[in-house]
Regions:
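A SIS-like phosphosugar-recognition module
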Residues: 1-176
Length: 176
């Protein structure tokens, strides 16, 4: 709270085994720091701790990442991922292993893309470039592209300024 008046902190692990990670830190941080008096029993005149929250991986992307990217509150975010996946229960089934490996690659792509986007933001040129890529794909698939009029209407809703604080914690693997 005392760091650029950020009142909240997001913990975003990209491994389902850490789906309760934010809850663990909620208890430790908010219970320990959620006080209105100092250790001598005197009232304090500063903020004592942020609201800690989060969700595993892409679950959060479809729930609250837009708030982190485009919202009016400064929300520092800690992203956590592992180079090697931790779910090996189905590795003996080649098709399942292949599917899980591909899924892990997608997770890592998202893990690296989110902090970069929060750093750089997206300006009008970037939005137009995204629509150009989307339209090229649609044309190739025989679908109608997004019209210039529609692009112009949507641009304000896709802009965000960047310069949002993040940490990326990337480890080799998650072990017990």
């Amino acid at each position: 709270n005392n760091f650029y008046k950020a009142q909240t902190q997001a913990l975003l692990p990209y491994d389902q085994h850490l789906h309760r990670f934010a809850a663990y830190f909620q208890q430790g941080n908010m219970e320990s720091n959620g006080k209105s008096t100092d250790r001598n029993g005197r009232p304090i005149n500063y903020q004592t701790g942020p609201v800690v929250w989060g969700e595993a991986g892409t679950n959060g992307q479809h729930a609250f990442y837009q708030l982190i990217h485009q919202g009016t509150k400064l929300i520092p975010a800690d992203f956590i991922a592992f180079a090697k996946r931790s779910d090996h229960e189905f590795d003996s089934i080649p098709a399942m292993k292949k599917q899980l490996d591909e899924h892990h690659e997608i997770l890592l792509t998202n893990f690296f893309a989110q902090p970069e986007a929060l750093l750089k933001g997206k300006d009008e040129a970037g939005v137009r470039e995204d629509f150009a890529v989307e339209n090229a794909k649609k044309i190739k698939e025989g679908k109608a592209p997004v019209s210039e009029e529609e692009i112009n209407r949507l641009i304000p809703f896709k802009l965000f300024e960047g310069n949002r604080p993040t940490n990326s914690i990337f480890c080799d693997k998650l072990t017990p």
